[in-house]
């Protein structure tokens, strides 16, 4: 729409975006450049390498990804708000479009749960988080609970920003979703 866009290439839709062998066992390194309106922001699997402004447009070049299956390649662009939190040398950025301050205030719980999931996974496996970054994008009306794109995890807004009196099931569901997408 005129406000934002995102990719969702699971299970074998990458071939609709670019020519590829669209099967999970074959991985590739992706480089991406996006030409977007100047007031938009963009998020992808890898960190931003450079931004260039020209005549109301923004050209964003991203660093090359680590090897990924094609269905895990992702980018998001649009008018997003963002919050960042750093702990133990890791910074996570949350992108969202929610305007209700009570819902946005849940960012503390969301960050707590993401950092806890990452720490548990690293402790359990003995392997540090293998990707350059972990950003999360809370997408209005996202058709699944979430999608584990490395470096740019997408989440459904209703599953992340709960109502004023969430049930235990809703709270546990959010934690389970975060743990699932983190692994």
Residues covered by each model-derived region:
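Short active-site segment of divalent metal-dependent hydrolases/proteases
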Residues: 183
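Hydrophobic helix-coil surface modules that form long, contiguous segments used
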Residues: 8-12, 19-179
């Amino acid at each position: 729409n005129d406000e934002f866009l995102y990719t969702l290439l699971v299970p074998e839709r990458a071939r609709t975006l670019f020519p590829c062998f669209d099967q999970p066992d074959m991985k590739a390194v992706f480089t991406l450049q996006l030409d977007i309106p100047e007031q938009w922001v963009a998020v992808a699997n890898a960190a931003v390498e450079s931004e260039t402004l020209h005549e109301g447009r923004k050209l964003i070049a991203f660093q090359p990804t680590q090897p990924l299956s094609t269905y895990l390649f992702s980018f998001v662009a649009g008018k997003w708000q963002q919050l960042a939190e750093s702990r133990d040398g890791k910074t996570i950025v949350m992108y969202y479009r929610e305007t209700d301050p009570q819902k946005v205030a849940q960012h503390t719980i969301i960050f707590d749960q993401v950092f806890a999931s990452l720490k548990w996974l690293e402790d359990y496996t003995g392997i540090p988080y293998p990707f350059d970054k972990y950003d999360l994008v809370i997408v209005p009306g996202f058709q699944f609970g979430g999608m584990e794109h490395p470096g740019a995890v997408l989440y459904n807004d209703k599953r992340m920003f709960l109502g004023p009196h969430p049930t235990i099931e809703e709270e546990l569901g959010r934690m389970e979703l975060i743990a699932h997408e983190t692994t």
